């Protein structure tokens, strides 16, 4: 549901209640099935074994030189998410409920654009991604991107630039240039 509060302000709300698939051992969810394939009887035994409710909202401002927003998302399962502890999954999400609050921003100044997003989970762990781009003309663009995702940051649905498959335990800088060598 979306509300246009004024010419520049928008408020969005969303809610989801769905059954999900994964391994369930008594009252614990031991793994989430994310591939969507149900080819074997073992796959079918994992289908719709627990419930997830998600509620959230976003307040955003869209101005001439600045765009920004504040987002909050709350997830709750009907069972405890508790994967078996292994060396490789020490910091995987664990618990019954998850809260994430984030801000996004984009500033325009002459040929520069600074943008990014910073989020915090319910335990105070941070994930942030920031980008500065400079376009001196229509054929060239210089970009610097920085990311820092705390080793223990937990968000079930976060997606961002990363070398791994989760927004967790990474930091890095990317420097690049985009150009049109052949012209228009």
Cite the ranges covered by each PLM segment:
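Exposed, low-structure sequence patches enriched in small/polar residues
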Residues: 48-85, 90-184
């Amino acid at each position: 549901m979306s509300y246009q509060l004024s010419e520049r302000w928008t408020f969005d709300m969303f809610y989801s209640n769905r059954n999900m698939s994964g391994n369930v051992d008594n009252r614990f969810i031991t793994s989430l099935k994310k591939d969507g394939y149900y080819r074997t009887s073992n796959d079918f035994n994992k289908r719709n074994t627990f419930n997830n409710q998600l509620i959230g909202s976003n307040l955003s401002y869209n101005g001439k030189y600045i765009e920004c927003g504040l987002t909050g998302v709350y997830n709750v399962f009907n069972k405890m998410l508790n994967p078996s502890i292994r060396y490789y999954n020490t910091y995987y999400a664990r618990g019954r409920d998850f809260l994430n609050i984030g801000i996004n921003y984009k500033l325009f100044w002459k040929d520069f654009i600074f943008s990014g997003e910073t989020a915090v989970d319910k335990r105070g762990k941070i994930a942030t991604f920031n980008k500065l781009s400079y376009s001196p003309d229509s054929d060239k663009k210089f970009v610097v991107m920085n990311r820092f995702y705390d080793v223990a940051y937990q968000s079930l649905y976060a997606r961002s630039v990363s070398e791994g498959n989760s927004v967790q335990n990474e930091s890095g800088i990317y420097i690049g240039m985009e150009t049109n060598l052949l012209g228009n």
